[in-house]
Every structure is written in C-alpha cells, then in structure tokens.
Amino acid sequence: MLSALCLLTAASAFAQESAPETVVIQALDGNRESIELTVPYDPQRIAILDMASLDILMALGLEDRVVGSASSSLEYVQSVVTAEGVANLGTIKTADMEAVMACEPDIIFIGGRLSGSYDTLSEIAPVVYLPTTDEGTLAQTRLNADTIASIFGKEAEVAALFEGFDARIETLKSFADGKTAIVGLVTSGGFNVLGNDGRCSIIGREVGFTNVGVDAEIDTATHGNEASFEFIVEKAPEYIFVMDRDAAIQTEGAKLAQEIMENELVMTTDAYKNGNIVYLAHPAVWYTAEGGITALDIMLQDLEAELLQ
C-alpha cells in the first residue's frame, strides 16, 4: 500500500515537472501579421472577446475557466456569457478595458473587430487573435481548435469534435456542382456582395457554388462591396444567398432582408422565380461567430435545410 502511494506521488510530481510553463503558438498581431506568440500553458483564467474562440473552448470543456466575456446574442453561449461570476467585458467590437483588467485574466481571446486594441490588451495578458477564413472555414476552424487545444494540453480531443463535417460538406458540394450564385449581406437598406475571401466564403470556397459576384478589384472580405440590384440582374445567378447583417446585430427599426431583396428588379431573376433566394436562418452566427465548431454546425444546417430538403 505504501509503495503504491509512493508511486502515485512520484507520478504526480513527474507530471507537474514535465508540464511546460509556456507554449508557443502561431497567431496574429494587431496588424494581422502572423507571429509566434508565447502564452501560459494551461491558463486558469480566460477573458473572452471572440465568440468563435469561446465556442471552441466550450467544445473542449473549458468554459468553467472563463472569468470575463463580451456580451452576445448567440443562444448557445449564454450559459457562459451570463453565468454568475463572469464579468461583462463589453462587446466583441468595443472592449471595456477596465473590466478586462479587473478580471485578471491569464490569457485573452479576441477577433478581428478588436485588432486595433491588440497592443493595449496585450499589456494586460497575452492576446490570442486567430484567423477565421484564411484556410477555408472548415480547415481554419480545425486549425484554430488544434491551436487552442495545444494551449491546454487537449490536442487529443480535437479530432472527435469534427467528425461528420467533411461528409456533410461533400454532400453539399455534390448539390452545388456547376451552379452559380451571388453571396451577400443586407445592411442599411442595401445589398453588399461578398467574395470567397471572408464572411460566408464557405458557400463558394468549400461548398463549391461558382460565386459570380467575385471581383478581384474590390474588397469583399468584411462587409462586402455595395452592389446595385441591376448588378444581380446582370450576373443572373441561379442562387442568391443573403445574410441579414441588421438582424445579426439587432439594428432597431431595420427592414427585414426579404423586404429589401424582393423588389421589382430582383423578382425578374430566375433565382427568385425558382425559389432560390436563400436567407441564412442564423445571421448572428454567420456574422459574429464564424470559426467556431457549433457555429460551423449551424451554418451547415442552414445550407442543408435550404438546399437538400
């Protein structure tokens, strides 16, 4: 009995000695340049200013370490962001710096909207800023999950979290093969075209619709390029995918995307006549949480419900 206890004690001591104090990961700096970032290994106090990162942390079972979080309307993160003892750190666009400092985090996760605050936040704790679409949505989400898991010694748990995603995308690809589309977001009464390099790029990049709205001369990565409805008529896509930004950010008094899109011009298109205008059912997920595992599942569900039923 005594020898068994000694062995357990020795094993525990060895594990503690072999665990590193820090780990080096690939991340982005405030200029969106790739850097090697040293962060504490297995940090106990996490500040969340990015919902995709929170999504991955929850999938890894680390939500109990969150000491502060930005607010969010996403239903699946409410158990964390509104939990007792979790400080409100502002929003994913504007952080409450005093609140972040007060919660004494060991590590801070941010998204692109806070890249301008990277240096200020880095004075509080190491800031992990990960890309969301550089490698394609699925590949980048998987890569980010691997990165986050490596910080906490949970690398072995990642593969199981992505089971089934490849097959689902292949099914959608079979449907999309040879079909044309325009992808865009509705905001402030207008329609902005999105390319294959940012938001909603999974539709053209991985699912495989030919995105006829892509134009190398314009920046389509963030809010897209404002397009006239004549542009849609001219391009004559078979499908039109619409993300309602105003609904995503809960803009008061904004018109619904359907009211804006279904006008005299758009109603002349085959996409409208054939019932192929797809309004993405969970715009807040597409707009604020792309890059998370649950978010990816919901995004695929939105496409499957419209295209495969």
What are these model-predicted stretches?
Residues 119-189, 276, 285-309:
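Extracytoplasmic substrate-binding proteins
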Residues 45-99, 113:
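A short, structured surface patch at a secondary-structure boundary
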Residues 1-41:
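Short, low-complexity disordered leader/linker segments with a strong preference
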Residues 221-249:
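Ligand-binding pocket segment of bilobal, Venus flytrap-like solute-binding proteins
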Residues 28-34, 89-97, 218-227:
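Short helix-initiation/N-cap motifs at beta->coil->alpha
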Residues 45-57, 157-214, 222:
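Basic- and aromatic-lined ligand-binding clefts that recognize polyanionic substrates
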Residues 25, 45, 140, 176, ...:
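Structured C-terminal subdomain patch of bacterial secreted/periplasmic proteins
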Residues 97, 101-110, 126, 232, ...:
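Proline-aspartate-enriched helix->loop->beta-strand connector
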